[in-house]
Amino acid sequence: MKLVMVSGRSGSGKSVALRVLEDLGYYCVDNLPLPLMDTLLEQLKDSTELVAISVDVRNMHETELDKQLSNLPEGTELLSFFLNSSDEVLLKRYSETRRLHPLSRSKTSLKEAIDHERILLEPVSKLVDHYIDTSNLNIYDLSNQVREILLGSVDKELVINFESFGFKHGMPAEADFMFDVRFLPNPHWEPELRPMTGLDEPVQLFLSQQPTVNKFIWQIENLLETWLPHLERNNRSYLTIAIGCTGGQHRSVYVTEQLAKLFSQSKHTVQARHRELSND
C-alpha cells in the first residue's frame, strides 16, 4: 500500500494537494485524527493500494506523529508533504476568505493563531519528505508541483466523455460543451433506416455521405483541438461533450462515435456513451 500524508499550516493549500491525490486515484481522508490511522489502513488494505490523508495542527503532535509513522503496517510505502506559507500570505488568505483559523479562540487574534500554529508545527516540518512553500504559488502551480513529485511529470491525463442524447428526453446536466445536430439530414425519414441507430452500418453510410455532417464533425474537432490544451492547463480531469438530436437514436449517435474515434488517436482517454440507447 502507498500512503501519502499531507500536513502543514492552515491555509497553505492542503485541500488543494488532497484534491490532486483524489484525481490520481487515491482514497482520501481529510483531517484524520492520528490515533485512527491504523484502523483506516487496516480497513482499506484489501480494497485499495493508494491512500492519502491530511492532518492539521489540532490532531497532530510531533511525538505522536513520529510514533505513528514508525509503526505503519508492513509493506506500507510512505510519502509525506509539508505545506507552508509566509505569515503575511496566510493573513491575507484568511482575510479574503473570512474563514476561521483552527486555533482561533474568542480572545485570540488571527495573527496570534497563525504565529502559534507556526511554532507548533516547526518540528513536524522537519520529519517530512517534501517541503513546499506555497507563498507565491496559485492552485495550478501547487497542483503541478504535487503531481510532478508523485509522477515525475506534470502531464495530466484528461478523460474526454462524448455523450449522445435526445433533446425530447432532456439535456444532460453534466455537459461542459453541447452541440445541437438537429439541423443535419435525418435518417428517421428514410423508412428502411428508421428502426436502426447510428451504430448500424446503413445509417453510418447514409450520414457519412452528407457534406454538412462531415463539415460539422470537422468543425467540432477543430474547436476542441484548439481549446483542449487550455483546459488541461487548468487541471481539468474530465470533459463531457454532449451531442444532441431529436430522439438520440441516429444523428447524435453517429456524430458521437465519429468524434470518439478521432480523439482516441490522441493521448487522451476517450469514452463514448449513448444515453438513449442505454435506456432501451
From Swiss-Prot:
GO molecular function, a single term: ATP binding
Signal sequence range: none
InterPro entries: P-loop_NTPase, RapZ-like, RapZ-like_N, RapZ_C
Keywords linked to the UniProt accession: ATP-binding, GTP-binding, Nucleotide-binding
Function: Displays ATPase and GTPase activities.
Residues involved in ATP binding: G8, R9, S10, G11, S12, G13, K14, S15
Binding site for GTP: D56, V57, R58, N59
Name of the protein described by the UniProt record: Nucleotide-binding protein Swoo_4243
Short name of one Pfam family: RapZ-like_N
Top-rank taxon: Bacteria
PANTHER family according to UniProt: RNASE ADAPTER PROTEIN RAPZ
Family: Belongs to the RapZ-like family.
Database matches in HAMAP family: RapZ_like
